[in-house]
C-alpha cells in the first residue's frame, strides 16, 4: 500500500483528535457560544483570541458542514479569529458579509469554490483588493464554479493581486481578455483554466518565464489548431506540470503529437493526458525516458497504461485503469472531476468484485468521490456498487467505524436524492444490509428507516423486499418509542409490513422475508402504544391468528408472532381487543408448547391480561382461574434456556405485574423473565433494573407475607445478583436507556 494511502487508512482508524472534537462541537452548537449583533450576525461571547491554525480549521470545518452564511461568518469579524488560509467552499454569503468577515485578515490562501451566486469573482477580488497586505501577499486563490461578474461590461481586477502565485478558475465563463490580464501577474506560477470559455491560449506567452504549472482540462471552446497549441506550450520552458486531459469528447490528436515532441518541456515532472485519444504505451514510455525526472503521468480513459513500465507502483505515479494502484491514484487526483471519478469507479468495481482483503484506503477515496458529486447519478451509481464490494460480508468488520459512518451517511443521501432509480436504491440497500453497519456504526437510524420504508412502499422486488425488511427489523429496535410512533404515522409502515405477512401467509411460504417482517413488526411495537394501535386498526390481530394457525410447527414464526402480541398485551388501552375467546384459547394451547420460547411468550400474554383483575376479564371466570393454574405450572416446568431469548428496552412493563400478590402465576412469569435476562446479560440488565427502581419492587416481594415461595425464591436470587453487581461495579448512575435489537 502506498505510504500516503496507508496514512489515510490509519487516520480513519484512529480516534478523532481533541481539536477536531472541540471544533465539531463548537460548529454544531454555535448558538450556545455566540450572541447576535444588531444586524443578526453572530459573534463569540468569550473575548479570547484563537490561534491562527485553529481559526483556519474552524472555518474549514464550518465550510465542510455547510454552515457558512451571512450570520455565521460574523464570528470571523474583528481580531478574535486570525485567518491565514481561508476555506469558504459552498458558502451562502453576500459580498458585504464576505468583505466584513474576511478581507481584514492577512490571508495568503483563499478557496472560494462554489460559493453561491449572490457573490461574484469581481466582488471577491474587489474585497481582497481593499486590503493592501492581501494585494501583495495573497499567494493562492481558488475561484472555481463561480460567476465572473453580473455586470456587462465589467471591470477587470485581477491585476490588483500583484502577489498572486497560484490561481484556479475552473468552470467559469472566463475569456481570452481575462486570461491576458491574469498572465500579466508578475509572480504567477500556477494556473488552472479548465472548462473555461478561452478560445486562444497565446496570452500565456506573457508569463512563459514564470509559469511552472498549467492545467487546461476540457478547454471545450479552444479554436487553435494542434500545431498552434504546441507552439505556445513549447515556449513554456519552465513548466513542471501540464494537464491537457479531456472528458473523451474530442478526437484531437494533441496528446499523441505532444508525446512525440523531443524538444519540448525539458523540466516537466508531471503530465496528464487522461481522456485523450490516440495515446499509446510506446509513445508515453518514449516521452518519459527522455525526461527521467518525470514523477506522474495521467492515463485514465486512454488506451495506455498497461505496460510493465507504467504500472504506477514505483517512483513514477500513474493514474489509469489497469490496476488498483492506478485507479487509486486517479480517484485521489480527480476527486473534483465527475467524469473521471465515474471512470475510475467503473474500473474499481470490476477489481473489487472478488476482493478478499479489507481496503479502507480505497473506500476512503470512494467516499470522497461520492461526497464531491452528490447529485451526479453515474458517480453515485458506480460508487454505491463499489461500496458494497468493499464492505460486504466480513470485509466491513475490518473497516474503521468512522469511515463506515461517512459512507453510510452518503448512501442514505444517495437514496434520498434518487428515490426512483431502482439500481441505485438496490446498491444502497445491499450495502446497508450489514450487521456491522446496522449494529456498530453511528448514523441517523430514523432517517434511514424512513428511506428504506419509502422504498418498500414503492417497490415489489422480492429479493430487495427481503433486505429492506431485514434492515427495518434491526433499525426499529434502535429507535425511540417516539420515533417508531412517528414512523408508523408518517409512512403507514405497519400496514405495509402486514401486507407482506398476508401475502406470505396466503402463499403458505415460510421464508426469510416473512421472518424479517415479523421481527420488524415485533420491534416496532415494542413499548410503542401508538404503533400497537396501528397494528390492531389494520386487522393485525386477525392476521396473526391466521399465521399461528397456518404454521403450527414453525416455532421461530410462533415466537415472533407471540412476541409482538406480548407488546399488544402490555398496552392497557388495547386490553379489550384481546378479550376474544378464540384468541385466548389458541394462546392457552401454546402455553403448553414443548418449545420454551413459544411457551414463554404465550405465558407473557396471559400474565398481562390476567394482571388487570377480574373486572377487566370479560370472558369466563373459570377459564381465567384455569389459566392462572396452567400459567404457574407451565413456568415451573421450563428448563433454563442456553441463550438469551429476548431483549428488552426497559423493565417498566414488568413492574405492574410484580405487585399482583393475589395472582402468583403473573408474578412468577415476571420474575422468571427478569432473572432470565439478568443472568444472560448482567452488565446490561442488572444496571437497567437498578436504575429503573427494580430493587424496591423485589424487596417488596421478598418481604411480603403472602408471596408465593417460588416467586420469592427467584426474587431473592435476582436480588443476590444485583447486590453482587453493585459490589463489582458500583451503583450505576441514571442514564438514557439505549434500545436494543431483539434476538430473533
Curated annotation (Swiss-Prot):
Q: Where are the LRR repeats?
A: 185-208, 216-236, 237-261
- Note whether Isomerase occurs among the keywords: no
Among its keywords, does the record have Cytoplasm? yes
Alphabetized, the UniProt keywords read: Cytoplasm, Host-virus interaction, Leucine-rich repeat, Repeat, Ubl conjugation, Ubl conjugation pathway
Q: Which Pfam families match?
A: LRR_Zer-1 (PF25013), ZER1-like_2nd (PF22964)
One GO cellular-component annotation of the UniProt record comes to: Cul2-RING ubiquitin ligase complex
Q: Give the GO biological process terms.
A: positive regulation of proteasomal ubiquitin-dependent protein catabolic process; protein quality control for misfolded or incompletely synthesized proteins
Q: Please tell me, according to the UniProt entry, what happens when changing residue 526 to A.
A: Complete loss of N-degron binding
User: Which segments cross the bilayer?
Assistant: none
Q: What's the effect of swapping residue 570 to A?
A: Complete loss of N-degron binding
Q: Which family does it belong to?
A: Belongs to the zyg-11 family.
Subunit architecture: (Microbial infection) Interacts with SARS-COV-2 protein ORF10.
Protein role: Serves as substrate adapter subunit in the E3 ubiquitin ligase complex ZYG11B-CUL2-Elongin BC. Acts to target substrates bearing N-terminal degrons for proteasomal degradation with the first four residues of substrates being the key recognition elements. Prefers Nt-Gly but also has the capacity to recognize Nt-Ser, -Ala and -Cys. Involved in the clearance of proteolytic fragments generated by caspase cleavage during apoptosis since N-terminal glycine degrons are strongly enriched at caspase cleavage sites.
Spell out the protein name for this chain. Protein zyg-11 homolog B
